[in-house]
Amino acid sequence: YGRGVSRSVPMGDVVEQIAKLVDRGHKEAVLTGVDLTSYGPDLPGKPKLGQLVKAILKHVPDLQRLRLSSIDSVEADEELTEAIATEDRLMPHLHLSLQSGDDLILKRMKRRHLRDDAIRICRDLKKARPELVFGADLIAGFPTESDEAFENSLRLVDECGLSFLHVFPYSPRVGTPAAKMPQVKSDVIKSRAKRLREKGDEVLSAHLTKLVGTIQDVLVERGGLARTKCFTSVHVGDHFEAGSFATVKIAAHDGKRLTI
């Protein structure tokens, strides 16, 4: 709503831009877009996202880390799935645009996947690349969402093995079909969002706990923070220069990030 028609940047232009960034010392690139897995149908030859990923990794050999932003899991093409499973420089973290774990709500959202699709893709990718970590967007209180539908979303967190949640309480936008549907009461929306966030805290803590005691290669950012390959935040203080790589041993976590 209000976004207009998707426009894809030609593959050659993307490769060229990333190559220039690497020449200037950048070590990681992130592919982003409103609907990243819809890349390519407006370009000659209609390349898909998987082809773009492979082209970047092939033609920019000095790029050390490539990430994908939020993707629609069911739209992941075969080459992209293969790259996720086999390309070490494609980081083992995917943020999925799931939105709900209930089929009826997904249909009313006009999503392109159903609940079982999300579970299947997470299961298959995790089997192909065990270190893969998933995050997801979930909306609480979409119009007509029943208690049962909400519980389906809550269960999806474990069934997909999610470690990071972005939870959004639904708010109507004038002119959209959803705004004309029967609305969930605001106090119910707040309560459901709170429960989803609590679930997010739970699975994040479990993910962080698994990493305590491990050795991690991190890319240092500003503010004394760094990121593991699986996008987990690590507090490294002022021990390392921003933009550098470091190998650190994880000592603990504070529920939100790792510490050394």
Predicted regions and their residues:
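Canonical Radical SAM [4Fe-4S] cluster-binding loop centered on the CxxxCxxC motif
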Residues: 1-15
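Terminal RNA-binding accessory module
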Residues: 172, 180-260
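Conserved SAM/AdoMet-binding glycine-rich loop
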Residues: 23-147
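C-terminal, non-catalytic macromolecule-binding modules
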Residues: 128, 148-193
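Conserved, mostly hydrophobic/aromatic
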Residues: 14, 31, 68, 96, ...
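Short, acidic/polar
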Residues: 14-18, 81, 147-155
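Non-catalytic positions within long, well-ordered alpha-helices that form the structural scaffold/packing
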Residues: 22-23, 158
